[in-house]
Amino acid sequence: MAVSRRTILCALAAPLFVTRPAEGAERLGRLVAAYPHHLARLDGQVVVWTDGTRMETGAGRPERPFEVMLRDATLTDQMRQAYPAGPPAGPPGRNHSPGRIRSTAFFVKMYGDCRRGGADRRHRTVTWMPQTRPQPLPVTTENDVATRLERVIAELERLPDRLKAYLVPSSGTFNCRTVADTGLLSMHAYAAAIDINVARSDYWSWARERGDIPYRNRIPFEIAEVFEAQRFIWGGKWYHYDTMHFEYRPELIGGA
């Protein structure tokens, strides 16, 4: 049977990844399960919060271009890209940056809006690397993030001394700022992220060449592995890499 030129063009224009309805519902189910203190259930195409708030997920809508989702993400968009836990198999594919696509409305409701004040009332001080180079850092108590980071720190202190130079000093946790290329709040604005030693790290914007992003990383996976065990994802697994960066995103990674 002859294939028309229009059929070929439509096929080429289709999204590379198409989420089936059942698959999309399963991913949204993982989102609800990841935040039991805040999310009650999935009701059709709506996430119901424990306070009764109903939030549309965007389920059933066609997948949009990466740059559009990055700046205007639905909850379904937030769950589209799978985070590859475990040792890296190689550089991330083009635009595969699981965790960068996120709904600002979702996280502002969960952690508070630092631009309006009061979010810091949910923070407490965590001492970063107390046996190596103590440094007080504010971290959110929502979703037990502060407690989980303390577990990370305890394990990092057990690593060989040769790895400590990648960790200290930390480049910070809470910072009420936006992401440079999107204008949306960073996970640092929720005090749910930490940057390790910037002097030993790499960032995609520093290395961009003629529209391409050559992958660079100096952070040993032994460090990222400790964070992943507590459900922090690593920016070193993003196409738009940020190798100093870790953020608490339990909907994207399993763990205790």
Language model segments and positions:
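Cell-envelope/glycan interface and biosynthesis
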Residues: 29-30, 34-237
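Generic structural signal for short, solvent-exposed loop/turn connectors between secondary structure elements
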Residues: 1, 21-26, 238-240
